[in-house]
């Protein structure tokens, strides 16, 4: 299934609409046809689980237009979501955005901003958002993010190297495109972040060439400072991610589904581990194949996923049933 097969009737609003029209459009809607899924299968929902403060503690998958769904979630989740990850349409001409060419770019910008403004309201004050884009809209995406979240809350531009330069892409008479961009923003400067370290490789381990009287290895940091291998955490991850292969280069993974643009679980694991902790709420309002939700479930996070296309049943829902069953 390609994104071109997934034609969308998206909802936009802009400054030409009267404020009352916008308010009516974004009034909270009633969610219907709820069902509960657990290890025993599907059940009729008899109510949502809540904590002592009345906060919903169930994981939610919502089928519907994500603009309306986001607006409807505000009552329950405003200020409560710790992490948002989205992998929105890249506006390539092959992703369902088949509008009049003269409005294509502006339509994408309006589409993104409408949703980001509501998404920001859902984030907790120590929350973060990651938005994944390619060269088509990454730079315009940053301008929108600067406007919605504030330029001072821009944290990093993460470059994800897709893998080996092979196949039809290598035939271009130009520098070969080999990366996507992930924009990392926080809601405030007081954001939650867990620094991640990678194991040392063989060359890096050789730098611990000193040995003290007790036989412990160390390396010299400064004239007066040593770092012992036993105390070293590893190599802190930078904003260049070249150690996670995309499905453009990995073709035999059991994760792969019939869906263009699917992201590997390792990518979401890194993002979720970096910017959330167990029990925190993770939101993905472009749920797609459900990778974010599957990884969040495995990592003990609460999650909310939104997808309007009918494949929500055959892709994210069926995938999560397997995860819930213990995959």
Where are the model-predicted features located?
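DnaQ-like (DEDDh/DEDDy) 3′-5′ exonuclease domain used for proofreading
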Residues: 1-83, 92-106, 114, 158
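Conserved S-adenosyl-L-methionine
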Residues: 105-109, 264-327
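Class I S-adenosyl-L-methionine
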Residues: 234, 238, 242-276
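Phosphate/ATP-binding catalytic cores across multiple sugar-kinase/actin-like superfamilies
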Residues: 66-69, 73-76, 115-116, 222-223, ...
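Conserved SAM-binding loop
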Residues: 62, 130-131, 285, 305
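Conserved Class I SAM-dependent methyltransferase catalytic core
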Residues: 105-160, 317
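Flexible, glycine-/basic-rich loop-and-beta segments that form/coincide
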Residues: 162-227
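Conserved proline-anchored active-site loop of SAM-dependent methyltransferases
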Residues: 79-95, 145, 282-296
């Amino acid at each position: 299934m390609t994104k071109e097969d997934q034609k969308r009737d998206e909802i936009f609003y802009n400054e030409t609409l009267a404020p009352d029209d916008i308010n009516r459009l974004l009034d909270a809607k009633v969610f219907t046809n709820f069902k509960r899924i657990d290890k025993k299968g599907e059940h009729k929902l008899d109510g949502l689980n809540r904590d002592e403060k009345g906060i919903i503690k169930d994981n939610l998958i919502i089928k519907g237009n994500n603009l309306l769904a986001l607006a409807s979630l505000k009552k329950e989740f405003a200020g409560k979501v710790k992490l948002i990850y989205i992998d929105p349409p890249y506006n390539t001409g092959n992703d369902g955005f088949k509008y009049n060419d003269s409005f294509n770019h502006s339509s994408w910008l309006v589409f993104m901003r409408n949703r980001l403004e509501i998404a920001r309201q859902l984030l907790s004050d120590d929350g973060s958002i990651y938005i994944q884009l390619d060269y088509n809209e990454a730079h315009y995406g940053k301008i929108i993010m600067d406007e919605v979240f504030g330029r001072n809350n821009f944290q990093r531009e993460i470059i994800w190297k897709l893998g080996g330069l092979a196949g039809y892409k290598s035939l271009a008479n130009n520098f070969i495109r080999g990366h996507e961009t992930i924009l990392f923003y926080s809601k405030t400067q007081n954001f939650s972040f867990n620094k991640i370290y990678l194991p040392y490789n063989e060359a890096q381990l050789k730098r611990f060439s000193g040995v003290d009287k007790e036989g412990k290895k160390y390396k010299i940091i400064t004239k007066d400072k040593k770092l012992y291998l036993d105390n070293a955490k590893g190599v802190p991850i930078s904003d260049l991610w070249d150690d996670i292969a995309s499905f453009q280069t990995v073709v035999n993974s059991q994760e792969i589904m019939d869906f263009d643009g699917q992201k590997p679980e390792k990518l979401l694991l890194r993002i979720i581990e970096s910017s959330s902790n167990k029990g925190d709420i993770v939101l993905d309002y472009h749920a797609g194949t459900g990778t974010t939700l599957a990884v969040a479930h495995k990592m003990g996070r609460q999650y909310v996923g939104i997808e309007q296309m009918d494949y929500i049943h055959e892709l994210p829902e069926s995938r999560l049933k397997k995860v819930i069953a213990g995959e």
